[in-house]
Structures are given as structure tokens and as C-alpha cells.
Amino acid sequence: MREYNLFTSESVSEGHPDKMADQISDAILDAILRQDLHARVACETLVKTGAVILAGEITTTANIDVERIVRDTVNGIGYHHSDLGFDGETCAVINMLGKQSPEIAQGVDRADPEEQGAGDQGLMFGYASNETEVLMPAPIEYAHRLMERQSELRRAGELPWLRPDAKAQITLKYDGSKPVAIDAVVLSTQHDPSISQADLQEAIMESIIKQVLPAELLHAGTRYHINPTGKFVIGGPVGDAGLTGRKIIVDTYGGMARHGGGAFSGKDPSKVDRSAAYAVRYVAKNIVAAGIADRCEVQVSYAIGVAEPTSISINTFGTNKISNDEIIRLIRTHFDLRPYGITRMLNLLQPMYQQTASFGHFGRQGSETAFTWEKIDKAEILKADAGL
């Protein structure tokens, strides 16, 4: 008898308050990296009605206008008028950023860059699956694409009543590890008070859901919940406080893979919470692209001030074509997972982080220097070395 199971993932829009905070933190990081590639940045953001509060530790020679960066970022997201409940030009900006502890610096910095220590202890996971073209789990991939479509239509003015805050959730039916049907779609979007619920639901269905989700996965039994609570006029930081790093599952694999707990945004590449998570996505994606496994989860861990990972482990969920020990050998041979090696391998000292802070960090393309961890340039080398 065939076994079916359901799996659900969610995404949120760029106007969600937590994602606002992520984008502000990464906008500040990008501005600093444009002037100082050796900066140490850990920037946290809190947004709530009428205010943006910054805190964290930064060591840099860069001279940036923090307040202007915050205002431009908020305006760029779409909160640029008091009618929306939040205005980037008039909100308070409270700057509580300080300097990084010299005790941390002495553990990280080295005369030989190759021996740069990890910025903290921790564990990170990377994942890839061949169920979608971008080698991402299908539920989170489709949820992200719904949110991207909402943003595109809002920015283009095609649905002028859309506002920045929105959420999407996809429940997929699996036959084993293969997605075979979409069981439920939830999409809630902030909107102007002028639009009726009937018109909103029709527009969301026709212009977003049907334009994004594969028709072959939709069926007569698919359930749709479009703004199921009714009105959603009050949103963004007026409706809820937003914090950097509070959407770590949205940022990664939608719960399909494990998570080490560390957030990404506002952190320079010396923080392995971010850089190593990108690196093990790169590893897992190339393993799957090489046909070595259909699904692959890679874990790596670090000790503060130590360059070499304290562990590398994998789970291929029984889909591996060679032994797991041999896959570990391939990883150690072809990927430098020391902090400096990761930065060099993925060219991470680039001001490209703000674009990662909405619609997921994985399974995407952006500017020429962004999302380098999505390349599959090692797949053929791995395949050859594996003897496949």
C-alpha cells in the first residue's frame, strides 16, 4: 500500500515586520562592506510603531549614515506614508550600536588569514533535494514564489490596493519523497480598506496563486484560504513588532531540514552562523546535483577561535549512491570549510546581503555577486571523484 504524507512550509513578504528588521540589518552591513571589507558587524534591529531601534557590535573604519540607510530601506520596502501606519521619513531611529569585544577579536583574527578562527561556536545545517529544479524543498520554494509575486504586483501597481505585509503557507502531499499534489494554500495580504473581500480573493487567486503554483499539483480537493480572517488593513510594524533573526525557518528550508539556531542577517562572513550555513548549502546542493544522493543534509560545527570545523556529518535519507563515509571524504577533499576558506570559496566579502533578507536565502539568483552558494560548479568534479 502506498504511503502519503503532508508537509507544510511558510514564507513571509518583505513588508513583514521581522523581514523589515532583517533588511535593515543587512542594508547596514552592505553599506559598511562597501567601505571596509574587514569590518566585523553584528547588527540587530527592532521595529515597532513609529520607531526603528538598532543594537549590536560593529568594528569598522567605515563612515556611514546609519539613519539615512534605515530610512531609505523602510521607504524602499513600501512603508513611506503615514496612511500605511509607518513612514520611513518620520519614524524615530535610535542607534545603540557599539564596538565588538576585543576578547572576541583576539580569538578570530590571525596574522595568517587562512587560520582565521570561527567567530563563535555553533552548528549549521545545509540541505538540498532533487524535488525542484533549484534543488529546494517544494513547500518552501512555492511559498517564497507566492510572496515574490505579491511583491511584484504591488510594486508594479497592477494590484494597487496591495500593501507590503503578507504571508503564504503551502501544504504539499508527498508520495514517499516525491511531491504529488498541493493539499492547501494559505495566503494573507495586507490591503487598502477600499477593496472588497470578494474582489481581493478573486485577484489573489487569479493573479498570484494560479500564476505561480504548478497546475499539475492543483486539483479539485486543494483547499484555499485567502485572507481567512477577513480584513487585513493594519499590518507591518503597527500590527506586530519585528526583530532581526526571527524568521530562521523561512530563511532556510521551511522546516524540511534541521536548523542550528543561528540567524543570518546583520552578520559579516566571519560569523559562521551565516557563512557556514551558506557553505553547507553549497556542499549539499553540489552533492545532489552530482547525482550522489537525491536528498542530502550536511551538518558542520565550530569552536570559537578555531579554524577547522569540529565535525562534519551527513544524512542522505537512504538515497545515497555511494557510502556516507565516501561522501564525507569528498566534502573534505573538495570544500574548504574553514571560515576564511568559506569566505574565499563563495566570495562573501561583497555588499550583496540585503537582497538575501527577503524571499529566502536559498534556491535563488540575484545580482552577479550574490547567492554564490547556489552554484553547482563542483558537481562534475564530485561525480568524477565518486566514480559515477
Swiss-Prot record:
The GO biological-process annotations, alphabetized, read as: one-carbon metabolic process; S-adenosylmethionine biosynthetic process
Q: Which principal EC class is assigned to this enzyme?
A: transferase
- For the ligand (Mg(2+)), the binding residues are 18
What Pfam families would the database entry show?
S-AdoMet_synt_C (PF02773), S-AdoMet_synt_M (PF02772), S-AdoMet_synt_N (PF00438)
Annotated residues that bind K(+) are located at 44
- Annotated compartments: Cytoplasm
A single GO CC term for this protein reads: cytoplasm
Source taxon at top rank? Bacteria
Keyword Magnesium applies:
yes
Catalytic activity reported: L-methionine + ATP + H2O = S-adenosyl-L-methionine + phosphate + diphosphate
Q: How is the cofactor bound?
A: Binds 2 divalent ions per subunit. Binds 1 potassium ion per subunit.
Keywords (A to Z) from UniProt: ATP-binding, Cytoplasm, Magnesium, Metal-binding, Nucleotide-binding, One-carbon metabolism, Potassium, Transferase
Where is L-methionine bound in this sequence? Answer: 57, 100, 240, 271
Q: Which GO terms describe its molecular function?
A: ATP binding; magnesium ion binding; methionine adenosyltransferase activity
Its cofactor is: Mg(2+); K(+)
Enzyme Commission numbers on file: 2.5.1.6
Query: Which residues bind ATP per the record?
Result: 16, 165-167, 231-232, 240, 246-247, 263, 267
Keyword Ribonucleoprotein assigned to the entry: answer is no
According to the record's subunit comment, the protein's assembly and interactions are: Homotetramer; dimer of dimers.
Q: Which NCBIfam families match?
A: metK (TIGR01034)
The record's similarity note reads: Belongs to the AdoMet synthase family.
Q: What does this protein do?
A: Catalyzes the formation of S-adenosylmethionine (AdoMet) from methionine and ATP. The overall synthetic reaction is composed of two sequential steps, AdoMet formation and the subsequent tripolyphosphate hydrolysis which occurs prior to release of AdoMet from the enzyme.
- What's the protein here called? S-adenosylmethionine synthase
Species for this entry:
Psychrobacter arcticus (strain DSM 17307 / VKM B-2377 / 273-4)
**The organism's taxonomic lineage, starting at the top:** Bacteria, Pseudomonadati, Pseudomonadota, Gammaproteobacteria, Moraxellales
